[in-house]
Amino acid sequence: MARQNKQEAIYEFIKEQLREKGYPPSVREICNAVELRSTSTVHGHLKRLEEKGVIRRDPTKPRAIEVLEHSIMKKEMVDIPVVGTVTAGKPILAVENIEDTFALPINYVRNKKQLFALKIKGDSMIDTGILDGDLAIVEKNNSVLNGEIVVALLGDRATVKRFFKEKDYIRLQPENETMEPIIVKQCEIIGKVVGVYRKY
């Protein structure tokens, strides 16, 4: 099995069996699936999953395990702010800049620093797959490397470009062959793009 903790593996196996067979696995089947020898260990994991509110069991029945999907979704997702506009001189996450929220898997957010989503306007990054109307998932961070896609503040507007620190200037390179790079002496880097969401 893929490397993951046993509790996660048990939960995923229960969901898989419910999807494929329509009923949950037995404790012995769980043992075999996640490579545990002791049924008491599985019972312990099931008890902890129940305490977390992600499954429900009927102790009078051997296979009565119910997955509480609504609870799972709520526990596994977290909202990040969606920024519609960026105003010079104000924090990126100022209340007046936030238009909405967007749900991301909690594991994704846990491994990053402060995240927000920015609405993309225009087609300057189409060659890298970032299109007008997309939501760019941005990690708030002003320390970036050459070649990374960043959100830079130029005057009173934010722009998403590929960042290059040259000898005497900064080059903000679009990913659109019809557009010229933006050359500036300095600019404020708000963060780097770590993902893109597109609604179909």
UniProtKB/Swiss-Prot annotation:
Catalytic reactions on record: Hydrolysis of Ala-|-Gly bond in repressor LexA
Physiological role: Represses a number of genes involved in the response to DNA damage (SOS response), including recA and lexA. In the presence of single-stranded DNA, RecA interacts with LexA causing an autocatalytic cleavage which disrupts the DNA-binding part of LexA, leading to derepression of the SOS regulon and eventually DNA repair.
Protein's GO biological process: DNA repair; DNA replication; negative regulation of DNA-templated transcription; proteolysis; SOS response
InterPro entries: ArsR-like_HTH, LexA, LexA-like, LexA/Signal_pep-like_sf, LexA_DNA-bd_dom, LexA_repressor, Peptidase_S24_LexA, Peptidase_S24_S26A/B/C
Pfam families reported for this sequence: LexA_DNA_bind, Peptidase_S24
Any one GO molecular-function label of the UniProt entry: DNA binding
Family per similarity comment: Belongs to the peptidase S24 family.
Name used for this protein in its record: LexA repressor
Gene3D superfamilies: Umud Fragment, subunit A (2.10.109.10), Winged helix-like DNA-binding domain superfamily/Winged helix DNA-binding domain (1.10.10.10)
Enzyme Commission numbers on file: 3.4.21.88
DNA-binding region positions on the chain: 27-47
Site (Cleavage) residue list: 88-89
Residue ranges the record marks as coiled coil: none
Organism: Clostridium tetani (strain Massachusetts / E88)
